[in-house]
């Protein structure tokens, strides 16, 4: 709702009183659709939908997969009567997920809300319960007869009334269906101390918020053909990575290789089968699959009998497999090349059969009797390979985004849970074996170790190592990350991030580049600079990710609608038939693809087929592909159809629909009319007005950029005569075949780039820089920052919404939680203190609170328990009985060891006092006396900080031990060296601050807050920075927000006109006067408000110097780092400079005296540091040489002494001789 004022007048007469319900919509109206989308979906729907799918369906599927454990106990036949065989069976049924709970140390279980989990460092997780049935069967074992088991006992587990058994805890994603916040109203959220702007989509593990980053991978089950580079004997290869739809992420790869380079004779084709050592000629595989005659094999590969080129290419292959003419021999041929050696022929044949059934193209099926399907699929792969080899088709593009999948929380957790559940069932089975062998009673409580699943999931989410703890090295790292809470937009952006797990140091540029197919799905600007550039991406605003639906209904539908099954397909009888694929499996062929496609589309638009399913008809290749799998990135588009009344293509969405959407929105905001039927995004989807398109389907449609592009060309021609200079120039379209239309082109941007005003007027890397810096800007990250105890938080005192806004900010809540202030900026050279990206700031504005911020840091500690009796205690340590106390003052602590809120603290003051008891027999490095009974374990404030204690939280952790968090607050005032940035990648630090009387002023007496240097503009081409300033000036004068959205009709000309109307120079220049002399400045100064952000790099957090201080234990050199009061490293390059200068004494002083000078005595005879020196008696002796006189004292770095001694330990003897000892 851009303009409530305009819509109000409609509401007075009639809610639907728009001009004409069937009138075409304008670009403005599409924002109503976008609002509807975000009102229903939110910005993290991809995370939530994925997790909900996991809990609702996947979890149960995994349990059903290994649902039954069977243990047979055969009769031992030790005595006559011992002829009874037993069979024990445990089966898992339905799984139940509770609401999040916590088990306290005293045994009480109660509901756990997210805020409590954050404050007490708990895990926000639900219990998993499963129905377990136990059955026992018996049979009388008569030799030579099959066992006939009779059920003798069946029991459900009765520890709870319903027979549910606890198997572990599942961390719950906030705002998902299982979370308490999902149905909470705004007032409930305030009661729970949650911020209504918090969007969920993350987990709370041990009190810290964790996001699962979407992991990008290549899609399975698709055939791809690649050319091989010259040295390889293989010219082309077709490969498919088969992954089972459901079930383990078990992947088997099949490669079909074309040997021989172009022009060489005998170019045979061979395939690499799993578990088979050599490549097998394809004809042999066909024969092993039961397709014997040559003609039939060729027909499986080449669908056109008259295609002599392809048949010619297949000639060598037929000759290659000529020796083998029946199925048995072919299977034996494959079996011989297997991994199992020295087995009989029958076994070998069975082995080959098993491989072809289970390992060869397992995604088609793993059952037997589907040889013909697999043969056709293999033929299809060879066909694709030959098409590429004959240059009729290009090789596949590895970086095509439609051939990629993103694994979100659902698939990631499923993969992990499957592994853990397998481990759990294995443990249960072992326990069953033990109880049966030792004839104990079977106790379900002991059998199920619930910790397996609980700690397995918690470990993966806490560390980000995705996989089992034992295999930490092989698993992926960084899958789960701590949620970035620096500013609201950085949080949103983090929840929409994707990662490509390729080695970061790979020199390959291709995977990092922006690909055409990323359009509208991935933000083109927001990616990190440096080693992860292009590998870490962010989703565009309207992107969603499919959660995966069951393909069975579609397959059934296809069969009913005239798809001939693959088994009955005879290529030469129907040469024009279209191949039908569902999720990469070739199911059959169809004679009338156009009509089938039409039907499928209609069904999808009605909602009978899930809207996220994608359907692609490739007319040239005669293929129809349908994808229902999870992880495809898709986005919504308007549907364009032929309009009979108008006689040209027109959007299906009309003004009437927009009116209904706006009425519903008005209803939500104002509580408007009673009789408004709810009309939401789903209504648009179900009425077939918009549809979801993924990257693969996008290849087969034609998209118009704006609704206006659909107007027929004739209509525009008469308007071309009087061109308004203030209008943007439109591209003229002569296409009439549009099938879809963009909802709005600015939706190609992601979260961070949507905040930039006029990004379409900037050089592209500048938008990338701002996307990174916008995440470091201070603002208000959430409205409940006062009740949260984050490790660090920065809050701007007076955040303002920007004067130049973009329409997308409405959905990013940037007006509600902004991160910056509108500073009055002059672009001028003044005094020279703003060179090289520094700027001059007005000290008087700073004194009034410009860019001031609060900084919070929390310190956490808990009483740990060692063994049964020894526990740490919070108290004020006393010097008399406590060892190893810190240097800081303990005076500010109360007697309970905690500091009171409101106390001013400075560096190294102790803020949490804690002691550990020492056992009486322990020896403490000679400091210990009889009185000392405790050791200090207190927490001091960071040495470089100071502030005021803001809040102290005392509670207990899950084990019932005392647990405290102390939050310290500091005010950070802008000073020289602090970093600021506009929203265009124009960052700079303060070079100097002048009071207002020293600043230049305009004729109206306005003084700028900031002066930036004009040299920052031309080479960087951030024109938008200037346009923003101009627009903000108009906005400030007129009192409206300026719309700086990209790809709109706003032009500099138009803004200048408005500024002129307000009585200012149209291009934003003003006459200014020198603040020191009062004289007019020679030049006109570009002057106006611009939105600036305060970034988190502040000089007070970086300043560092040291004279003497702590040394490392091993090398006795200064320690490293500001936090440890470390030294400044004089490194190799600095050393080289000093050598080049010839400054030898300075070099020695830096590298030795100022670091680790050390004195040793060496023996003049053996040259070793073996001298025993009694300095107070002035006696020296080298025992080995019996030498008391020829002894030298030398000064060398301690690190050098250490090196010599380490070399001695390796049996290398460095001997040190002085000039004098050589003369001796």
UniProtKB/Swiss-Prot annotation:
Residues 467-478 are annotated as: Fork loop 1. Its main location: nucleus. GO terms for biological process: RNA-templated transcription; transcription by RNA polymerase II; transcription elongation by RNA polymerase II; transcription initiation at RNA polymerase II promoter. The keyword Magnesium applies. Zn(2+) binds at residues 1163, 1166, 1182, 1185. A zinc finger (C4-type) spans 1163-1185. NCBIfam families: PRK09606.1 (NF007175). This is DNA-directed RNA polymerase II subunit RPB2. It comes from Saccharomyces cerevisiae (strain ATCC 204508 / S288c) (Baker's yeast). The lineage of its organism: Eukaryota, Fungi, Dikarya, Ascomycota, Saccharomycotina.
């Amino acid at each position: 709702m851009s303009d409530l004022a305009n819509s109000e007048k409609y509401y007075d007469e009639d809610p639907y009183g728009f001009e004409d319900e069937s009138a075409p919509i304008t670009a403005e109206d599409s924002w109503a659709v976008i609002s509807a989308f975000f009102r229903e979906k939110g910005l993290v729907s991809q995370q939530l939908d994925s997790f909900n799918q996991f809990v609702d369906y996947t979890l149960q599927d995994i349990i059903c997969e290994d649902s039954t454990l069977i243990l047979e106990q055969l009769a031992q036949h030790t005595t006559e009567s011992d002829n009874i065989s037993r069979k024990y069976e445990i089966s898992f049924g339905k799984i139940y997920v509770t609401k999040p709970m916590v088990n306290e140390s005293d045994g009480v279980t109660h509901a756990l809300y997210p805020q409590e989990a954050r404050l007490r460092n708990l895990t926000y997780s639900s219990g998993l319960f499963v129905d377990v049935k136990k059955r026992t069967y018996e049979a009388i074992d008569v030799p030579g007869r099959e066992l006939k088991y009779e059920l003798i006992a069946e029991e459900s587990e009765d520890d709870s009334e319903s027979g549910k058994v606890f198997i572990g805890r599942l961390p719950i994603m906030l705002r998902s269906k299982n979370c308490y916040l999902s149905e909470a109203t705004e007032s409930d959220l305030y009661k729970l101390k949650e911020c209504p702007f918090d969007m969920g989509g993350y987990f709370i593990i041990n009190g810290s918020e964790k996001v699962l980053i979407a992991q990008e991978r290549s899609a399975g089950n698709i055939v791809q053909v690649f050319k091989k580079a010259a040295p390889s004997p293989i010219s082309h290869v077709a490969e498919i990575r088969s992954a089972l739809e459901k079930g383990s992420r078990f992947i088997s790869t099949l490669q079909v290789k074309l040997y021989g380079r172009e022009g060489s004779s005998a170019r045979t084709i061979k395939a690499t089968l799993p578990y088979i050592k050599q490549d097998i000629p394809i004809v042999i595989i066909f024969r092993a699959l039961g397709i014997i005659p040559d003609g039939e094999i060729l027909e499986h590969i080449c669908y056109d009998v008259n295609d002599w080129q392809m048949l010619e290419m297949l000639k060598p292959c037929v000759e290659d497999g000529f020796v083998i003419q029946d199925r048995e021999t072919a299977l034996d041929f494959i079996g011989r090349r297997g991994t199992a050696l020295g087995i009989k022929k029958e076994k070998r044949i069975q082995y080959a059969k098993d491989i072809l059934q289970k390992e060869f193209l397992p995604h088609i099926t793993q059952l037997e009797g589907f040889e013909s399907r697999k043969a056709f699929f293999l033929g299809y792969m060879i066909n694709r390979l030959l098409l590429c080899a004959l240059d009729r088709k290009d090789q596949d593009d590895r970086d095509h985004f439609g051939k990629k999948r993103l694994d979100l929380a659902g698939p990631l957790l499923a993969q992990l849970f499957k592994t853990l559940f397998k481990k759990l069932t294995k443990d249960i089975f072992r326990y069953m074996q033990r109880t049966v062998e030792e004839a104990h009673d079977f106790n379900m409580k002991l059998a199920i170790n619930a910790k397996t699943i609980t700690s397995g999931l918690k470990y993966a989410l806490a560390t980000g190592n995705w996989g089992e703890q034992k295999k930490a090295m092989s698993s992926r790292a960084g899958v789960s990350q701590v949620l970035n809470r620096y500013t609201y937009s950085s949080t949103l952006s983090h929840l929409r991030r994707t990662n490509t797990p390729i080695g970061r140091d790979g020199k390959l540029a291709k995977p990092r580049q922006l690909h055409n197919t990323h359009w509208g799905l991935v933000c083109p600007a927001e990616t990190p600079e440096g080693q992860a550039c292009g590998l870490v991406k962010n989703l565009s605003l309207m992107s969603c990710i499919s959660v995966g639906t069951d393909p069975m209904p579609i397959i059934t539908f296809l069969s009913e609608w005239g798809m001939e099954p693959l088994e009955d397909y005879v290529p030469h009888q129907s040469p024009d038939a279209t191949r039908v694929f569902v999720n990469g499996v070739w199911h059959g062929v169809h004679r009338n693809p156009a009509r089938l496609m039409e039907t499928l589309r209609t069904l999808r638009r009605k909602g009978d087929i899930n809207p996220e399913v994608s359907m692609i008809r490739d007319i040239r290749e005669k293929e129809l592909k349908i994808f229902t799998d999870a992880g495809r990135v898709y986005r919504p588009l308007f549907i364009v159809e032929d309009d009979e009344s108008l006689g040209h293509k027109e959007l299906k969405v009309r003004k009437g629909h927009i009116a209904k959407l706006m009425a519903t929105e008005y209803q939500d905001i104002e509580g408007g009319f009673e009789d408004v039927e709810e009309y939401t995004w789903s209504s648009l989807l179900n009425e077939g007005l918009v549809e979801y398109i993924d990257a693969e389907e996008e290849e087969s449609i034609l998209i118009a950029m704006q609704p206006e592009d659909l107007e027929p060309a004739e209509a525009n021609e008469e308007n071309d005569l009087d061109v308004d200079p203030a209008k943007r120039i439109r591209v003229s379209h002569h296409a009439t075949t549009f099938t879809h239309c963009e909802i709005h082109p600015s939706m190609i941007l992601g979260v961070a780039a949507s905040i930039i005003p006029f990004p379409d007027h900037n050089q592209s890397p500048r938008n990338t820089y701002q996307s990174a810096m916008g995440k470091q800007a201070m603002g208000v990250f959430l409205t409940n920052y006062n009740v949260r105890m984050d490790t660090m938080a920065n809050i701007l005192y007076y955040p303002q919404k920007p004067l130049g806004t973009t329409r997308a900010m409405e959905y990013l809540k940037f007006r509600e939680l902004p991160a910056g202030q509108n500073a009055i900026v002059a672009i001028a050279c003044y005094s020279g203190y703003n060179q090289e990206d520094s700027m001059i700031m007005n000290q008087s504005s700073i004194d009034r609170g410009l860019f001031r911020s609060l900084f919070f840091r929390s310190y956490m500690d808990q009483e740990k328990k060692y063994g049964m009796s020894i526990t740490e205690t919070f108290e004020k340590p006393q010097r008399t009985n406590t060892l190893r106390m810190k240097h800081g003052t303990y005076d500010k602590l109360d007697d309970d060891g905690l500091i009171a809120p409101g106390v001013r603290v400075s560096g190294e003051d102790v803020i949490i006092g804690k002691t550990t008891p020492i056992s009486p027999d322990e020896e403490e490095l000679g400091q210990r006396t009889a009185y000392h009974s405790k050791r200090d374990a207190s927490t001091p404030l960071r040495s470089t900080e100071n502030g005021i204690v803001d809040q102290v939280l005392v509670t207990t952790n899950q084990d019932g031990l005392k647990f405290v968090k102390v939050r310290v607050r500091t005010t950070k005032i802008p000073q020289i060296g602090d970093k600021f940035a506009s929203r265009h990648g124009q960052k700079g630090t303060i070079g100097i601050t002048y009071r207002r009387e020293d600043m230049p002023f305009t004729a109206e007496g306005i003084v700028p807050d900031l002066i930036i240097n004009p040299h920052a503009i031309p080479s960087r081409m951030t024109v938008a920075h200037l346009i923003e300033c101009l627009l903000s000036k108009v906005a400030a004068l007129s009192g409206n927000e300026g719309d700086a959205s990209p790809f709109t009709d706003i032009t500099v000309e138009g803004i200048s006109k408005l500024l002129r109307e307000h009585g200012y120079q149209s291009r934003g220049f003003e006459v200014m006067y020198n603040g020191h002399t009062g004289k007019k400045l020679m030049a006109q100064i570009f002057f106006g408000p611009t939105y600036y952000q305060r970034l988190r790099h502040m000089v007070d957090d970086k300043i560092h110097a040291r004279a003497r201080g702590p040394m490392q234990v091993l090398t006795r050199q200064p320690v490293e780092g500001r936090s440890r009061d470390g030294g400044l490293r004089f490194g190799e390059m600095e050393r080289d400079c000093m050598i080049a200068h010839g400054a030898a004494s300075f070099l020695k002083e830096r590298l030795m005296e100022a670091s680790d000078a050390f004195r040793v005595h060496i023996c003049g005879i053996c040259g070793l540091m073996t001298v025993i020196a009694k300095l107070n008696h002035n006696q020296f002796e080298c025992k080995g040489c019996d030498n008391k006189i020829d002894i030298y004292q030398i000064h060398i770095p301690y690190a050098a002494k250490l090196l010599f001694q380490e070399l001695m330990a390796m049996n290398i003897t460095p001997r040190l001789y002085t000039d004098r000892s050589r003369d001796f």
